[in-house]
């Protein structure tokens, strides 16, 4: 990777970024924050929804957290793979729509599903694990897909890829903190 003499002497091109990338980048950071907010909100509300049926012991919270962590990990993996195929804002929007639509069954069917599982599975540890898996894994996988996909959309300069990823995960984690506070206070 040797630079030519002209490249070494010539100052770097310092043109001002256009308005479109600034707007686009802000939208991507907001999207990451929203996704983090969404995950923590659903996770904490999930614990509250499950408590009347399975309790709120360490086993129940452990099952819920394990399902969310596993679903996020799977989403990160799939989102990274998807980002290799023609990434676009439209594609990111479709991930967000899928995330929201897959959360609808939680609102519509959580009580009957939790009720049925609490009666059919004797050990509440396994009932809560299965309940969390059935109700929360699908929307959480799609939530996990958002960040790696958004990172790919942010990166237009490989030298700043770490900075872009760091800022995106900063926004996502702040969103998670906001979702936690909003849901619990």
Predicted regions and their residues:
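Alpha-helical transmembrane segments of multi-pass membrane proteins
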Residues: 1-185
């Amino acid at each position: 990777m040797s630079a030519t003499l002209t490249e070494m002497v010539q100052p770097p091109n310092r043109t001002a970024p256009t308005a479109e990338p600034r707007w686009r980048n802000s939208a991507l950071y907001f999207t990451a924050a929203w996704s983090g907010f969404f995950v923590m909100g659903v996770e904490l509300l999930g614990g509250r929804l499950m408590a009347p049926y399975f309790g709120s012991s360490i086993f129940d919270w452990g099952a819920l957290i394990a399902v969310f962590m596993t679903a996020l990990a799977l989403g990160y993996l799939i989102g990274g793979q998807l980002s290799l195929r023609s990434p676009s804002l439209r594609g990111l929007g479709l991930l967000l729509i899928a995330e929201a639509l897959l959360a609808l069954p939680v609102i519509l069917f959580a009580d009957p599903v939790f009720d049925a599982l609490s009666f059919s599975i004797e050990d509440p540890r396994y009932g809560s694990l299965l309940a969390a898996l059935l109700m929360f894994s699908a929307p959480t996988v799609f939530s996990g897909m958002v960040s790696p996909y958004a990172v790919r959309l942010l990166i237009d300069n490989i030298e700043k890829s770490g900075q872009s990823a760091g800022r995106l995960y900063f926004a996502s984690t702040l969103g998670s903190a906001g979702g936690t506070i909003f849901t619990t206070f």
